[in-house]
Structure formats: C-alpha cells, structure tokens
C-alpha cells in the first residue's frame, strides 16, 4: 500500500507549477488565449449526455490556463493519487481517518445492483429498505391516508434540524418547487426562538407534520426546537397521543425517540458512514420526498448516481469534478485567490451557494494534513454567492473592478419553468448570464473606454477624469455550467459534481474532508457559559472582553 503523501508544496509536480506560474502563468491573458486558438472552446469544454434530461455543458475555456498549465495540473492530480483515493472512497475504505469511518453517501444513491461493502458487509439491502420505508410514508402523507389527530389531511411539513439536516433539504425543496405535490414546506434550524415562532404562526396544529432530524436525537438546537414545537402542539390538542400523529424522527436513537412520544415505526434511520453535509440523499431527505414526491426524489438520486459514475470511470482529463477541482487549486494555491463565487442564474437555486458554503468550507476548512501536521499552503476557499441578476446589482462591482481575484462559477438552465411574458424574462436573464462571463474575461481597455466616452460627448478634462473609472482590467476567470432545465435529475448531478470537486481538492491538499472538529470548541464553551446566564450576577471567570459582553447583556435584561 502506498505511503503518506509529502506536503503539497514539497511535491515536484507542485514545484513545477510554481515555476511555470512565476515565469509565465501569472501573465496568462484569457482574451489573448482566445485570439491565439480558434478552437479553445471545444478544447476546454465538456458535454455530459444524459438519457432523458439533455446535455450538461461545462465550459472552462474562460480560465487562465493553456496546454502547459493543464498538463501540469493533471500531473499534480496523478501524483497526489486522486484516482486511488476515489476508488478507496467508493470501495468503503475508512477514509475519514479521524473518526475511523467509511464515506459512502454515494451508496445512498447507488441505483445499480452491485454490492457496496463496509467492513465486509453489503449495505445496499439496508439502504433499499430505508428507501422503501420513506416511499411508503411519503405516499401515505401525500395521498391523505396519514392524517392528523383530528382526522384532517396534512398540509404543512416542518423540518426541524440544523446544518446538514437543514441546509440540504431546504436547498433542494426550494430548487425543485415546480415539482411540488401541494404540501407546504417549512424549515426551522436556528436556536433563536424567532425562527420557530414565525413558522408556527403560519401553520395549523391539526394539519402540520413535524420532522425532527437528529441522528443522536440529542442535538441541542434541534431538540430544543422540537420540544417547543411539541409543547405548542399539546397546548392546542390537549392530547399526549397527538404527538405520534404529528411528529416523525430521522434518527438512530430509538430510546430517545420513543421517550419524546414518537412511534418507533415512524423513525427513519441512517448510518455513521453518512456525513451530515452529504446526508440529503438519506432519510434526512424525507422532507424533500414529501415536497416533490418519492418518484422525483428517485430522479434526484438518479442524477447524483449518474455523476458518481462519470466521476468514477472517466479519465482525469475529461472528468468534470476533477477539472473544477484543479482549476480551484490553480487559483487558490498560485494566484492566492481566497474566495470562490457560485452564481446560479435561476431563482429556484437561490440557496445553492449557501448549501455549498457548508459543503466546501466545513469539508476543506482545515489547517492540518491527514498526518496532523500544519500545512504551509492554502486549503479551502471562502464560498459565497447569490442568484443572478441580483448579485449584479450588489457585489459584481468588486468582481469586475476590485483588487482581489475571485474565480466564479456561473450556472444556468437553457429552459425556464416559468416562461412568462412569452419567455422575455428568461431571455433577459440568459443574456446577462452570457454577458457577465464575456465581460469578466474581456474587460474594457483604456482606448475602448475613451472611444465610448467620446461618443457620449465627453472631452477634455471631463473625459480624462472619468476615464480611469470606466476601465475594466478583465482577465477574470469563470466557469459556465449549463443544463437543459433544473430538474430533479440535473440538480442531483450538479450537487454530486460539487461534492466530488470538494473531495478531489481535499485529496490534493492532503486533508480530511469528512470531519468537522472546528464546530466543537464554540459549542463546548457555550455549555460553560449557559449556566452563567441563569442568574443576574456579574461574572469574572473569562477574559475581560467575554466578561464585559456577558455583564452588558445581563445589565440590559432589566
């Protein structure tokens, strides 16, 4: 078995990239590269053919790369053993080394017949059994067979969870609203009581189903919110038995679930080889099923499985997740880009960037290697974004004319679910999608800006004073991803595409992308502070800042 990887910056392939960057790479100009190569788009784009959902296009030609850069990046992927790491994940090896766990969210969407082994046990029978349980329950609720404590049909579903138990289902139910089956979906995550209170104002206790999503059924925020929701239900129903009609659990803790009042037959389980931020494919996706129906949930799984197969079987140079990952490494580790923008030109995808903030930053926001050594190179970027065209009127100014390099992914569907005004809205949206990547690449030179101002009637000092402000340097890198339509299948494929991109980058950086110890310290300290908020006495047990904050808050309770 191959030994541990050397630090990335000591890897010969990395050093060759650094040498090329220093000598030529930093000066690559995307606009010039297009002038020199008429076939650049066909060379640096990829079309993935699906059976029923059209093609998925990845255009990565508007990047600061040429053949030399690309060959060096691929060489880096090979020496970092990306292919072997990929195979280890799919084969059920315990690649989450700090928790000694397999990483097999891909098994949840395995639509084939091959076994998937974890510790020599095929997990697929259990996966299929849980899916069958989800299907049965989903159909009962949507059809009206399952009813509330007063006999009324369920109209609203409230998912109570946090982190991966909230962000994924929320993003997907929003993205797939056109496929909704009529139930109204609500999500409560924040321990701030306002979140729950505002949702409860909108629903009727007789027709509301609560989903409590917590593997251990001990997550503080989730159980606190669930307990308050139960209190609200009982205040209205006056019947303890009503809990079983209005609450189900996504958990593996049967004792805690039944103690809460939920019938254990309405408990949906998952496994320790499913990480929270990769769990929407599991029982955590029950709220998705109830929103769009189980058949559409299966299409979501199918799309992810399609991308899994592409990632697993395609050579690195034509592998979409690998391509995105390598481009990210190029900008993060050589151009020192600190952020990456996800910019979907589809309103239904308005939570996509927020979802992958967790997916990327919780996975690759690490400063030590798998061997526990502090790394001396950049790892995970800050991920952010908003839907177009809203972002254009907010932060694109900085992307176009700011001092920081911000690589961007633009995502758009060729077809809209809402072709209102004869499709006019969507044509305007797409024209902006297309124009932005062109503008970021080409920019506007001094001469072009001068000619434009002259044509507008400016001259002399007035022109000279305004001229520098009208110049766009350009050469801003972008990827464009186009799907035929946002469907359950294409959304599943998009999510899996980014999941695998994150995985590949983690392998190259030699970090564990599947733990999240960074969330623990704050929670530990919060437990120590919470009892200090049970009384009005001043505290002096912390640093002066924390003491001052606690005492100021207490003083303002009066």
Swiss-Prot record:
GO terms for cellular component: cytosol. One of its GO terms (molecular function) is glucose-6-phosphate isomerase activity. Its main location: cytoplasm. The active site is at 362 (proton donor), 393, 523. PROSITE patterns: P_GLUCOSE_ISOMERASE_1, P_GLUCOSE_ISOMERASE_2, P_GLUCOSE_ISOMERASE_3. Pathway: Carbohydrate degradation; glycolysis; D-glyceraldehyde 3-phosphate and glycerone phosphate from D-glucose: step 2/4. It holds the Pfam family PGI. It catalyses: alpha-D-glucose 6-phosphate = beta-D-fructose 6-phosphate. Keywords: Cytoplasm, Gluconeogenesis, Glycolysis, Isomerase. It is an enzyme of class 5 (isomerase). SUPFAM superfamilies: SIS domain. It is found in: Cytoplasm. Its EC number is 5.3.1.9. One of its GO terms (biological process) is canonical glycolysis. PANTHER family: GLUCOSE-6-PHOSPHATE ISOMERASE (PTHR11469:SF1). Belongs to the GPI family. HAMAP family: G6P_isomerase. This is Glucose-6-phosphate isomerase. It comes from Drosophila yakuba. The gene is Pgi.
């Amino acid at each position: 078995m191959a030994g541990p990887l050397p630090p990335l910056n000591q890897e010969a392939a990395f050093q060759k990239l650094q040498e090329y960057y220093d000598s030529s790479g930093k000066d690559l100009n995307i606009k010039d590269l297009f002038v020199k190569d008429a076939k650049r788009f066909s060379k640096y784009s990829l079309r993935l053919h699906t059976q029923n959902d059209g093609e998925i296009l990845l255009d990565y030609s508007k990047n600061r790369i040429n053949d030399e850069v690309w060959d060096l990046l691929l060489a880096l992927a090979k020496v970092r053993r990306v292919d072997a790491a990929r195979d280890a994940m799919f084969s059920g090896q315990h690649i989450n080394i700090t928790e000694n766990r397999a990483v097999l969210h891909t098994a949840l969407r395995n639509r084939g017949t091959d076994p998937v082994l974890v510790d020599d046990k095929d997990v697929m029978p259990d996966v299929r059994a849980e899916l069958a349980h989800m299907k049965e329950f989903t159909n009962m609720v949507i059809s009206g067979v399952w009813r509330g404590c007063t006999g009324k049909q369920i109209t609203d579903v409230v998912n109570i969870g946090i982190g991966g138990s909230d962000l994924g289902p929320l993003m997907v139910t929003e993205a797939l609203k056109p496929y909704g089956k009529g139930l109204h979906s609500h999500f409560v995550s924040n321990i701030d009581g306002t979140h729950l209170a505002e949702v409860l104002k909108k629903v009727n206790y007789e027709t509301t189903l609560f989903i409590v999503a917590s593997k251990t059924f001990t997550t503080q925020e989730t159980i606190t919110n669930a307990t308050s929701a139960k209190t609200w239900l009982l205040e209205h129903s006056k019947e303890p038995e009503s809990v079983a009609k209005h609450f189900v659990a996504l958990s593996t803790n049967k004792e805690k679930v039944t103690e809460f009042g939920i019938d254990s037959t309405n408990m949906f389980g998952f496994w320790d080889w499913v990480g929270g931020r990769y769990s929407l494919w599991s029982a955590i996706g029950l709220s998705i099923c109830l929103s769009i129906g189980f058949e559409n949930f299966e299409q979501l799984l199918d799309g992810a499985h399609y991308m899994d197969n592409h990632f697993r079987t395609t050579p690195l140079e034509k592998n979409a997740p690998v391509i995105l990952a390598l481009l990210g490494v190029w900008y993060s580790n050589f151009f020192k880009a600190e952020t990456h923008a996800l910019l979907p030109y589809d309103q239904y995808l308005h939570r996509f960037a927020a979802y992958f903030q967790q997916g990327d930053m919780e996975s690759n926001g690490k400063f030590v290697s798998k061997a526990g050594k502090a790394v001396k190179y950049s790892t995970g970027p800050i991920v952010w974004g908003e839907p177009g065209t809203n972002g254009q009127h907010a932060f694109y100014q900085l992307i176009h004319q700011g001092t920081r390099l911000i690589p961007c992914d633009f995502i758009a569907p060729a077809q809209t679910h809402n072709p209102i005004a004869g499709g006019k809205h969507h044509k305007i949206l797409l024209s902006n999608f297309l124009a932005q990547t062109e503008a970021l690449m080409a920019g506007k030179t001094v001469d072009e800006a001068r000619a434009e101002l002259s044509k507008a009637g400016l001259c002399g000092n007035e022109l000279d004073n305004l001229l520098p402000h009208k110049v766009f340097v350009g050469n801003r890198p972008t990827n464009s991803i186009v799907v035929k339509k946002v469907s359950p299948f294409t959304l599943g494929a998009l999510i899996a595409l980014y999941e695998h991109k994150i995985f590949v980058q983690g392998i190259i950086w030699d970090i564990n992308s599947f733990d999240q110890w960074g969330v623990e310290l704050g929670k530990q300290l919060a437990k120590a502070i919470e009892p200090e908020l049970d009384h009005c006495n001043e505290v002096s047990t912390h640093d002066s800042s924390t003491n001052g904050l606690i005492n100021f808050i207490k003083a303002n309770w009066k």
